[in-house]
Amino acid sequence: MVDWEKVNSVWSAVESDLTAIGQNILLRLFEQYPESQNHFPKFKNKSLGELKDTADIKAQADTVLSALGNIVKKKGSHSQPVKALAATHITTHKIPPHYFTKITTIAVDVLSEMYPSEMNAQVQAAFSGAFKIICSDIEKEYKAANFQG
């Protein structure tokens, strides 16, 4: 059982620095999985150094973390925002579902580095559990849509 309260207690701190945290997460994603950059047309063929402080990466960071925050705040009752997120990523962005697992795993790592006192082992486990459920629910939407990407 996921402790959504623990997740949301840290998420409130995340919201005060959404852009910087999102930038760190996206840049780490691109560093660890360079092929992921190809799914972002504005970021294709650019070095991490070129992307670091651009308006485009900041805007994408806000978009990604705002969407994730909207889901997290639902405390498990997230079917509508998950369906909406999956729909755009299936039809418009065509991003394979395994990238959700990759980015949420990176998010736990980045949050643990940025908030070491708040992100103790129990809170990390709560985040990992929450993200696992969210990613599983997103994957169900992909399967229902018969995604071939």
From Swiss-Prot:
Residues 2-143 form the Globin domain. Pfam families: Globin (PF00042). The modification N-acetylvaline is found at V2. InterPro entries: Globin, Globin-like_sf, Myoglobin. It is found in: Cytoplasm, Sarcoplasm. Heme b binds at H89. Monomeric heme protein which primary function is to store oxygen and facilitate its diffusion within muscle tissues. Reversibly binds oxygen through a pentacoordinated heme iron and enables its timely and efficient release as needed during periods of heightened demand. Depending on the oxidative conditions of tissues and cells, and in addition to its ability to bind oxygen, it also has a nitrite reductase activity whereby it regulates the production of bioactive nitric oxide. Monomeric. This is Myoglobin. It comes from Mustelus antarcticus (Gummy shark).
